[in-house]
């Protein structure tokens, strides 16, 4: 195999301890292995024409299993195909076959199924059926065209007949027209239902009609006004209650104004004299004072 692990793959001197035999370990007489092998790596040199065929059969081409045309990993151009240009991919010989070996090229299913082209018998059957179908279609098309022409002629003849018959204008005098109108009126009067007449009995004749002086509207208006008056009286009774009980302060409490922001040191509510529940106290207002409660004066 090629040189040792320490050296580069392909032709050249192996410098490290490697498995197998290096090229320079085998022949010490070769001064330049790259020149003597003409750039080809491996144990075998390029031999003469007679021996080159044997080497290509054994190794599969110019290169061995390791060390290709320019020191590649695997053999260069196998199957006897020479390189037209450097670096080109070799042509694959069996392109028609599946590379994986898992294809279904041998399963034909007698020409049917997916991926099959059918059988030659199918092509023959189609060729024989096509002209028959074409002939039948042509005959059917001619029949349909003849039927349409016959229908068109029938329609033209039927359309021409009513045009020839024009409606006759009826003429009448004024007297005849008035007679027709009178007959129509009489017929309408006969259709109208007769008015029903009430038969007055003796009891109905003895009765008298009494007119009610009070209309219904007036009654409803009076009822509404009475309800409103009652509501007003109840509201007045509630208002007349004294509110002294609500204005009296509880025991131990003094009314005071709420303090504003203090101006001294200590921001926030309640300064030097502005806290809630200050020293100043106010008495409850008296309801009897006319100046404070002018609306409670007896009218």
Swiss-Prot record:
Induction of synthesis: Stronger levels in light.
GO molecular-function terms, A-Z: RNA binding
Keywords annotated in UniProt: Cytoplasm, Nucleus, RNA-binding, Translation regulation
Stored InterPro entries: HABP4/SERBP1-like, HABP4_PAIRBP1-bd
Tissue specificity field: Expressed in seedlings but not in roots.
Any one Pfam family match given in the protein's UniProt record, by short name: HABP4_PAI-RBP1
Short sequence motif Arginine-rich RNA-binding motif E-R-P-R-R-X-[F/Y]-[E/D]-R-R-S: positions: 88-98
Compositional bias (Basic and acidic residues): 45-60, 86-98, 134-146
GO CC terms of this entry: cytoplasm; nucleus; perinuclear region of cytoplasm
Residue numbers spanned by region Disordered: 1-173, 232-299
Annotated GO biological process: regulation of translation; response to light stimulus
Subcellular location: Nucleus; Cytoplasm, Perinuclear region
Biased composition (Gly residues): 1-21, 61-78, 267-278
Role according to the record: Ribosome-binding protein that acts as a regulator of mRNA translation by promoting ribosome inactivation. Binds RNA.
Family membership noted in the UniProt record: Belongs to the SERBP1-HABP4 family.
Listed name of the protein: RGG repeats nuclear RNA binding protein A
